[in-house]
Amino acid sequence: MEDLEEGTGEGCSGWFDREAICSDGSSDEEPNESFESIADMFDDGTQTQGNSLELFHTQEKEETRTQIQALKRKYIPSPEAGGDLSPRLRAISITPKKKKPSRRLFETPEDSGNGSLGNETTDTSSGFQVVGDSAVDVCDAGRLLNLNLLQSHNRVARLLAVFKEAYGVSYKELTREYKSDKTCNPDWVIALYSLSEPILNAARTTLQGICEYVFMQSRPTAAATVALLTVRFKCSKSRETVRKQMCGMFHSDPLLCLCDPPKVQSVPAALYWYKSSMYSGTFTHGEAPEWIKRQTMITCAMEETKFDLSEMVQWAYDNNYEDESQIAFEYARTATESPNANAWLASNAQAKHVRDCATMVRHYKRAEMKAMSMSQWVWKCCREEPEEGTWTPISLYLASEGVEVIRFLSAMKSWLRGIPKKNCLVFYGPPNTGKSLFTMSLIKFLRGRVISFANSKSHFWMQPLAEAKVVLLDDATRATWDYVDTYMRNAMDGNPLSIDCKYRTPVQVKCPPMLVTTNEDVHLNDRWRYLHSRIQVFHLKEPMPIDTAGNPEYSFSNRHWKAFFEKLQKPLDLSEDEGDPKDNGEHTQPFSCCARGTDVHV
């Protein structure tokens, strides 16, 4: 065995033995190593706090954020709704807003290729679909276009687009806008959609009975048939009334009806109505409105004249208008009948013309008043009162207050003539005796003026004395009588006095007859002894009787005073000859202040 060379002999070699020894050693040590690894699994040493608390807070914060995000997703349906919570936040945007694609009017959806679009009408089940406040029959093929119209985002925009497609002109160019549906107007422009020809023909007869002028056209389009009407009703109507009446007459949906007043000051609009009325397919009834004639007819254009101030002054004089605001308002109302008033409205100096007109009317009226005697003035006031009455309430009132009628007539006779020392009548007594009611009615009938001591601080408070036939000083107090005793003794006498008028030099006039009401008995107060001989006093003792309705039993109007002066003309020394212009030789031709034309014969 020893002779064999190492590594060449049979049996176990040295390599095998060495591997076997290594294998045996490792197998013996494996149990010990496994137990050691298990023992090292548990750390029995003292542990420190570390960052566990910070980790806990981070986890709680993340969980809270997740819950809040879930709530936001639950209660906010879209990002746009979230922006509505904060208008300022919604206004802030980094990316530009995308424009929504504009939809075409009555746009037909594209066919998918399977023929479903062609069978849409036949496959639709019968029923009604509510759009807004109106129910539309879906099964009706003619109403599908109306349904598409009502489902649009802007109904009026679609209606206007269809109108322009049919007539080639914008609806807004022919009409003006009324903000309120309650505003009334006789002229209306009406556009109706999806109407049948038999309904249009039947409505013509009905419109002739309720309208003075009718203009009707109908034109078909790819979307619907559009009917255009311009009507003038016999009375003014509001938009609500017109829409309700037209929808009932044409069996149309209110949402498919446009009603607006026409543009009456637009020449292109007037030319459109005038030219369209001559088409063969247009139905017209009645005479065209004046706003169409005025802007289209050559004769009407030639009749346009310049504004004449004298004609305006004559109109105000004939109607007894002296106040500027009243002149402006009443003259503007006659613009539809008077070309001169229409020219005044077109003028840029309306306010100046009104002031000039009022000034001239006051001048003419004042000169006319001064040219008449008191008797003529009283008869003029009687002639201009159309109603007839009786003077019984006046006599009963004086008798109830203890005033003798004969004494009152004698004092009034001297008062009307302005005799010195008898130019002022004073009515005094306790309150509620009817002093102001009685004297105010007389001043109103004689068209006198009222002066108030409240304006005594002004230099012009007595200016009405120069512009009236009679004046009234109502409710004179102690301060008033002191002022009269100091400064107005000459006025009480009925003598001439100087009055300071505004924008004029002091004017010398004779003080007109004056009425005074007061609660002070001037005759019993020696303080005003110099006024005792200048006034005629009537004591009213009893309170004015009141009926169950709270009104005074005695009423005094213009017709009562007219009967008073007519019945008592002889005791008052009112001459009938002075009252009748024909008897006293005066001319009966009315006053004329208009400029004469070139064709007037001299």
Swiss-Prot record:
Query: Highest taxon of the source?
Result: Viruses
Q: Which GO terms describe its cellular component?
A: host cell nucleus
Q: What is its main location?
A: host cell
Q: Which residues carry this modification: Phosphoserine?
A: 78, 86
* PTMs per UniProt: Phosphorylated. Sumoylated.
- Comp. bias regions, Polar residues: 111-126
Short sequence motif Nuclear localization signal: positions: 72-74
Its biological purpose: ATP-dependent DNA 3'-5' helicase required for initiation of viral DNA replication. It forms a complex with the viral E2 protein. The E1-E2 complex binds to the replication origin which contains binding sites for both proteins. During the initial step, a dimer of E1 interacts with a dimer of protein E2 leading to a complex that binds the viral origin of replication with high specificity. Then, a second dimer of E1 displaces the E2 dimer in an ATP-dependent manner to form the E1 tetramer.
What's the family? Belongs to the papillomaviridae E1 protein family.
Its recorded name reads Replication protein E1
